[in-house]
Amino acid sequence: MISVNDRLVSEAISHAVDLDQYGTGVVRRMLALLNRVDADLFAQLTAALVNLDAESFTVERLEALLMSVRTMHAQAYLQLDRALTNELREFVAAEWGYQQQLLPSVGVPLSFGTGVATAEQVYAAAMSRPFQGRLLSEWASGIEAQRMTRIRDAVRIGYVENESVQQIVRRVRGTRAAGYSDGLIEIDRRHAEAVVRTAVQHVAAVAQDRMIE
């Protein structure tokens, strides 16, 4: 006869696989959203740079021309943050339901008061706990700011080196042939991917912690 501990270990392994697959799906959806807004973002960046020739280039003029790009960029990451928030709210409801039925499903009765928190309370607890030293909201704003700085600095360097607008945009965004993975901002995409995966694991861990408190 399989012991309770063995069943719990089996459940933990199976659930870890499920969490990894779910996290991969969330990453794909978030990056697909980012890809859609990037198309508009870089079209606007190209249009802005066309109006800035090398002879009239100044940091002040560049900042003025990038204002609309910066606004669109911030809105893009706001969309990303909202989409991830919605994903995590739906996920925490399912994860909390799983945690509540886990012990009874392997023959361990719940004591009075165990698991009485609501999914919304678990979500609030997860959002109030930092992971890797920051809250989720701070991660989103941090990535957005770093990415915009990277774009601005790359444009400055491009003008100093007399690159064309197309060369500058291609160097920053990457090439379609490589799936845009060869651009300077690829590091920010990988950073966003890591944050999304960690956020899913973080929420799952908080749900488990609340269950055994």
What is each model feature region?
Residues 1-182:
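N-terminal leader/targeting and assembly helices and adjacent pre-domain segments
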Residues 183-213:
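Acidic, glycine-rich two-metal-ion catalytic cores of nucleic acid-processing enzymes
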